[in-house]
Structures are given as structure tokens and as C-alpha cells.
């Protein structure tokens, strides 16, 4: 069973062509590292070796293709992210930790989120960890009090919570529309339940020290 908080139980790391964590992140994970096209360039700069480079390979430095194994997928109807996910699925390397999903052009980021919503993977963009909670799902999360958390319905969802500063009671969340951004945990354990739709859950690794810690509580 994979652990969305401690990043354990995942079968691979998929690197997209965005902002990547530092080298120490990769050295502590004993799983295959797969680079989606140009992400291999960033891994090289970090001194991290991918097990495979895949995609249409129009962004990776040619020298790296002489050094590391690669799989060229020419299909222009899918993104490098989707091509890499196809490889992971075929080779039983899911669920995966997805890094590099942010950074770069806004349209790329939005498309990456769109693809991510269809997966059972973990988004890791320090200091944020993210995952999708689907319809009729429940989860208990052990988090430090005052941990910042955002809950976004994509495209629309109904969710309830226990243990947040601004509780949600059958709250309708939608994108575009109203969401629960920059909420905070009140207790060491919180409970989330999605009644309908899918929710993107984004959790900050560090406790956030700001004025929100002393703001009066309110209910949705």
C-alpha cells in the first residue's frame, strides 16, 4: 500500500520537464527513475541517472541518448507525460511519484494537472504533495496541526471533512468556481470524504506560520 504522506510504496519516479527536487530526493528512493523527454536534461544537471528516457525525444540533448536507454514514441496525439505513463503502466511501475509537474509555461502545467487527475499517482512539487481523492473515497491523514491544505474539485465535487480549521460539510467544490484553498489542519489527524466527483488534495510539508493561524474558524 502506498503512503501519500511518507512517499513510500510507490513503484517508480516519473520526471516531467519542469522544476525537480534536489538530488537527495532521488538518492533516498530505491525505485526506477523515468525521464519524460527534456526532463533528462534536468536530471543530468542534478547528477541523477534515469533508468529510461521516453517521449518524442525532441527536447533531450542528443548526447544523453548515447548514454542512457531510451524509448522513442512518435505519436503526436499524446504528450510526453502520457507516453511515459503508458510505459509505466505496461511495465507495472504504477503508482508513481510524479515530479516536475510544475514550472515552465502555464498551459503545460494545466495540461499536466489534467492528466494527473486521471491517475492514482502522487504529485511531488516541494513543499507540496498532491493526490486525487475520487468519488466515494474516504481517507484519514496524520498531519501536524496547522498544516496548510488545499482541496480543489476538478471539475466538480462534493466533500466533507473533520479536523480542518474551516470545515467542509457536503461542500460543493469546482474548478472554475469555489474551492477550499489554504485551509489548515486543527488536529493531528484529519478525515476527508468525497461524496461525488474527484478532489485534488494538496498538502504542504511544513507547518505554515502566518496570520491564518489565528483567524477565527468558520464553517462552509
Task: Identify what each model region corresponds to.
Residues 28-31, 49, 113-116, 216-218:
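Short, solvent-exposed amphipathic alpha-helical segments in soluble enzyme
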Residues 28, 39-40, 44, 85, ...:
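Histidine-anchored nucleotide/phosphate-binding helix
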Residues 133-220:
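Long, charged alpha-helical interface segments
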Residues 15-19, 99-103, 126, 203-205:
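Structural motif
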Residues 92-139:
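Anionic-ligand-binding alpha/beta catalytic cores of soluble enzymes and soluble regulatory domains
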Residues 69-92:
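Short phosphate-binding loop-to-helix
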Residues 1-63:
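N-terminal beta-strand-loop-alpha-helix module at the start
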Amino acid at each position: 500500500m502506498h503512503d501519500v504522506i511518507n512517499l513510500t510504496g510507490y513503484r517508480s519516479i516519473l520526471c516531467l520537464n519542469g522544476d525537480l527536487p534536489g538530488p537527495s530526493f532521488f538518492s533516498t528512493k530505491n525505485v526506477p527513475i523515468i525521464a519524460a523527454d527534456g526532463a533528462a536534461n534536468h536530471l543530468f544537471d542534478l547528477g541523477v541517472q534515469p533508468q529510461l528516457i521516453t517521449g518524442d525525444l525532441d527536447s533531450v540533448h542528443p548526447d544523453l541518448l548515447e548514454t542512457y536507454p531510451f524509448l522513442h514514441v512518435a505519436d503526436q496525439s499524446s504528450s510526453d507525460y502520457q507516453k511515459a505513463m503508458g510505459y509505466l503502466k505496461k511495465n507495472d511501475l504504477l503508482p508513481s511519484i510524479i515530479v516536475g509537474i510544475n514550472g515552465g509555461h502555464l498551459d503545460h502545467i494545466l495540461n499536466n494537472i489534467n492528466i494527473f487527475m486521471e491517475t492514482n499517482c502522487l504529485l511531488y512539487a516541494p513543499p507540496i504533495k498532491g493526490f486525487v481523492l475520487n468519488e466515494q473515497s474516504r481517507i484519514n491523514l496524520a498531519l501536524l496541526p496547522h498544516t496548510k491544505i488545499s482541496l480543489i474539485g476538478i471539475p466538480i465535487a462534493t466533500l466533507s471533512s473533520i479536523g480542518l480549521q474551516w470545515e467542509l460539510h457536503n461542500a460543493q467544490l469546482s474548478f472554475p468556481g469555489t474551492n477550499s484553498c489554504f485551509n489548515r489542519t486543527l488536529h493531528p489527524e484529519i478525515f476527508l470524504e468525497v461524496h461525488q466527483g474527484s478532489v485534488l488534495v494538496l498538502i504542504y510539508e511544513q507547518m505554515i506560520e502566518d496570520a491564518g493561524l489565528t483567524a477565527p474558524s468558520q464553517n462552509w
